[in-house]
């Protein structure tokens, strides 16, 4: 078997695939870049993972695609989950993501389009924040992750 030191070295070198739960410390904030896939289960798991990171917890969430006729309710349930599990601010953008913001109640802030969201980010995000960016790949939230990385 492997020694504890060998296991620790291996884990330290681990890199996620693509934009799946990649943690990036920018010097301004900690970005959890998870722009590859989104569904209620993976969104809840990503929200749960924030608990291990210290700082104000912010989620920037987009549409979960291919959810069928229950899509509004499924999106709303993610917002409710975020608010109930210590997320301080839930920022959303997307036609269905507005239901996430509704579910988050007073913690929710919805932006109707990408330009308005990107313009608001410097005011919404603060030094030391832990920022989860998560949406289905088709929502192209990698652009938002790149902007978060540039904040200072």
Regions found by a protein language model. Name each.
Residues 1-152:
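ATP-dependent carboxylate-amine ligase
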